[in-house]
């Protein structure tokens, strides 16, 4: 779990810190951080990956305000399951699994055609998980427990 946090969170933090002065001096630009829907809320089989992505989303939200003063956009990309060698190793169902080409198209269009803070896809999955975020823990934990046992 520490390795995952070091790579996903601290690696991204170090990259942003490395370009921070450049963007602020330029007073223009766009920083996009790749998170995941796994960071929306605690999920089974995700005790390392999920928290690292939750930290990235929180980081993106925080620096949004810091960079906005310098006319630098910040966005966060929250993809669902994308077919990669890493997801090929998963031993659980991955609803709405998409191709890397699908993901690239969604990210590109989101960055070019939108001023949205978050680019998330596929909507069938992301909107469901966003709804789960507003539920009280008692209901959320009950529902996820039932869904996982199916």
Put a short name on every predicted segment:
Residues 36:
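Residue(s) in the substrate-gating loop at a strand-loop-helix junction
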Residues 18-27:
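A short helix-coil junction within the Rossmann-fold of NAD(P)-dependent oxidoreductases
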């Amino acid at each position: 779990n520490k390795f995952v946090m070091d790579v996903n969170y601290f690696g991204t933090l170090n990259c942003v810190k490395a370009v921070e002065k450049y963007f602020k001096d330029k007073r223009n630009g766009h920083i996009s951080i790749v998170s995941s829907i796994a960071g929306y809320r605690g999920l089974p089989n995700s005790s390392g990956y999920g928290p690292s992505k939750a930290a990235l989303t929180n980081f993106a939200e925080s620096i949004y305000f810091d960079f906005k003063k310098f006319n630098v956009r910040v966005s966060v990309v929250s993809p669902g399951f994308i077919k990669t060698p890493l997801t090929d190793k998963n031993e659980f169902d991955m609803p709405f699994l998409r191709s890397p080409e699908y993901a690239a198209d969604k990210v590109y269009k989101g960055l070019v055609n939108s001023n949205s803070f978050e680019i998330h896809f596929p909507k069938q999955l992301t909107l469901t998980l966003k709804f789960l975020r507003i539920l009280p823990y008692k209901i959320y934990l009950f529902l996820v427990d039932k869904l996982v046992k199916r």
